[in-house]
Design a protein with these regions (language model features):
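Cys/His-clustered metal-coordination modules, chiefly Zn-binding fingers
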Residues: 194-298
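Interaction interfaces in information-processing and related assembly proteins
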Residues: 2-223, 291-297
Length: 298
């Protein structure tokens, strides 16, 4: 492992109580994501927090696959999307009303408006996906996920998240299922976690942060895992999407515009298909038929 790598996820466990934890700190991954779009500060912060949360929760994937987390709303912010895989890769993007005024202090609920929802999908590499959709509870990504984990997973969880323009970080504590834990002990360890500041979460690595919080009852810390940005878009996937649209619609666009282009929301890669490409997808007969029909109607 590269000793200078700052995109790390670190597991830890307390030997004297049934509590496990995770710390994640993303620098290069996060900078790669925010360099692709000019995110308003409040949306950038919310997306970074969801990215850190996805990196934390994807560690629980028991099969090869992808965890997809979406926050959807009807306000100025339309959607946050994070995908994190069992191969320790992740990507993220957001959609918002680019004509709206968005500053740096708006809360998640301010941005989403009424009737926000949280959608979580587990997409195994082999097998059927599982999806849960719940109303948005809480005013932040951390509060939303805490409610979700308790209600849907029956796991008592404490999550702290932070993000700025350079770093996205998170800390998770979780009671081990089917283990007895004194309520005072859980209250104590979560109270210690509550003392962390956003600045500490963003600036300190796992070793220093865990010592700062839990030096009286130090946890056992495991070897960190390296996380990377990776986008799964491809020309082949865009071709499949165009095939689903149908030859008539795609050929009509190409006949009018000269080509059809599709941009990846996650990495901004542009895929351009001209008449030759569309001929290869649908056959020259389909394209020529559309062109002849357009000439007839003119």
């Amino acid at each position: 492992m590269n000793p200078n790598n700052q995109d790390l996820r670190t597991r830890f466990i307390f030997d004297d109580m049934p509590v496990r934890g995770l710390h994640v700190r993303l620098e290069e991954v996060w900078r790669h994501i925010v360099s692709r779009k000019q995110y308003p500060a409040a949306i950038r912060r919310a997306l970074g927090e969801l990215l850190a949360a996805g990196a934390l929760l994807s560690s629980n994937l028991k099969l090869e696959g992808t965890l997809i987390m979406q926050v959807q709303g009807q306000g100025r912010l339309k959607m946050l999307v994070v995908e994190a895989t069992s191969n320790q890769t992740c990507r993220a993007t957001a959609r918002w009303d680019e004509t709206a005024q968005i500053g740096g202090n708006e809360t998640l609920r301010d941005l989403l408006g009424e009737n926000g929802v949280f959608v979580i999908t587990v997409q195994p590499q082999d097998g059927e996906p599982w999806q849960g959709v719940v109303p948005l509870e809480g005013g932040s990504i951390a509060e939303m996920l805490t409610h979700y984990m308790l209600r849907s997973e029956q796991l008592e969880t404490h999550i702290t998240l932070a993000a700025d323009g350079d770093t996205a970080s998170g800390l998770l504590l979780q009671r081990l299922p089917e283990e007895t834990l004194d309520e005072d002990a859980w209250a104590h360890v979560t109270a210690l976690a509550d003392t962390v500041t956003a600045e500490e979460l963003l600036k300190l690595d796992a070793q220093h942060l865990l010592y700062r919080l839990f030096h009286e009852t130090p946890p056992r810390v495991f070897e960190p895992e390296t996380l990377e940005f990776a986008c799964t878009c491809s020309r082949g996937k865009v071709s499949d999407m165009l095939l689903m649209l149908g030859g008539e619609e795609v050929s009509s666009i190409v006949a009018e515009e000269g080509s059809i282009s599709v941009d990846c929301d996650f990495c901004n890669e542009k895929y351009v298909f001209d008449e030759t490409d569309v001929n290869a997808l649908f056959g020259a007969d389909v394209v020529n038929a559309v062109r002849e029909e357009q000439h007839r109607l003119q």
